[in-house]
UniProtKB/Swiss-Prot annotation:
Binding site for [4Fe-4S] cluster: 300, 360, 363
UniProt protein name: 3-isopropylmalate dehydratase large subunit
The organism's taxonomic lineage, starting at the top: Bacteria, Pseudomonadati, Thermodesulfobacteriota, Desulfobacteria, Desulfobacterales
Recorded family membership: Belongs to the aconitase/IPM isomerase family. LeuC type 2 subfamily.
Function description: Catalyzes the isomerization between 2-isopropylmalate and 3-isopropylmalate, via the formation of 2-isopropylmaleate.
UniProt keyword list: 4Fe-4S, Amino-acid biosynthesis, Branched-chain amino acid biosynthesis, Iron, Iron-sulfur, Leucine biosynthesis, Lyase, Metal-binding
Gene Ontology BP term (one): L-leucine biosynthetic process
Cofactor binding description: Binds 1 [4Fe-4S] cluster per subunit.
Enzyme class name: lyase
Source species, domain of life: Bacteria
GO MF annotation terms: 3-isopropylmalate dehydratase activity; 4 iron, 4 sulfur cluster binding; metal ion binding
Natural source organism: Desulfatibacillum aliphaticivorans
Subunit structure, interactors included: Heterodimer of LeuC and LeuD.
Reaction catalysis annotation: (2R,3S)-3-isopropylmalate = (2S)-2-isopropylmalate
Amino acid sequence: MGMTIAEKILAAHAGQEEASPGDLINAKVDIALGNDITAPIAIKLFRQSGAAKVFDKDRVVLVPDHFTPTKDINSAMQVKMVRDFAREQELSHWYEGGDSGVEHALLPEKGIVGPGDLVIGADSHTCTYGGLGAFATGVGSTDLAAAMITGEVWLKVPESIKFVYKGKLRPHVEGKDLILHTIGDIGVDGALYMAMEFTGEVIDALPMAERLTMANMAIEAGGKAGIIAPDAKTKEYADGRVIRKPVFYASDPDAKYAKVIEYDVTDLEPQVAFPHLPENTRPISQVGEVPIHQVIIGSCTNGRIEDMRSAARILTGNKADKNVRLIIIPATPQIYRQAMEEGLFDTFLSAGAVISPPTCGPCLGGHMGILAAGERAVATTNRNFVGRMGHVESEVYLANPAVAAASAIAGKIAGPDDI
């Protein structure tokens, strides 16, 4: 019996010829990742273990991004703990300030993750790197601490679901809409502890940024990982960027899947996920009148330069509604600089936007755009749970950058064709 791409990567990192769903394996990790929320716990456990050194200073990556720039004394103390540990351990990949950014945009940009890698991160959206053809998954701080010490992680090999996307996308329909549509179909537990393998002619045509967006939200369907087999576009992205030699895996023709789900997305509209779950999706034509107070364009889901350009195309020559706070957050300093050099900031500022430094900030209700009771936001983020972006009586609607920009202009949820 053949293997899926997920099974092949896990087998290789476990030193095995093959791996099957349900197998318990110990696998060597290529990258162990932590941030300013999760790394402090892992560091405390590391200290308690009596370990002196991390297993490999080139493979432990620490990126403060959730409460940065630090918003208060507690967050400053957490970042200080991580900073001190990174310096003590002489980590090669410690990023802060003008060299940092939102971790799941930063690591691909810097080539720290690549095709064929096994990446574990103490952040649920570590699954983002599956867009590059890696097996990447979120773990708790305890597993991160163990990986920092041993270089290994134990995993149960997941079953895989194969998603096949056929047709051709309409204008303003992006990878974000594909994944929202998928989650809306299967539900937030529809891929529980499964590898979601995205395939088909539509995926083949997607640029890397949108592939990363799709993989990023696999966890919102309960997925253990989201993964796209690497191809010529992946190679083009990886060449001269990825610091380790990439390995291109592909599923065997006779690989076994728990399910195969096909979608013809030719007529798919931009999608909007209503509160308070990402599965509550509706096409833009069925949204109705939903006034809003804030728009967030950014995050590890949609904060890349392609997302900035998508928003700018809609905002050009337009202004945000007087009742809408438009906040734009480029995910890394490099994206920030590129957006500035391309003149996108002129467009954003002319539209009345606030441009934030790179941060996760509002996505988790941390800072830089918290909602009050009764307020609604359209966001290009990945979660819209109760209280996710602020008060428990606020609401978050998830959408792609073009829809978010159009909504800012309209003062209500709107599609680009409405502007």
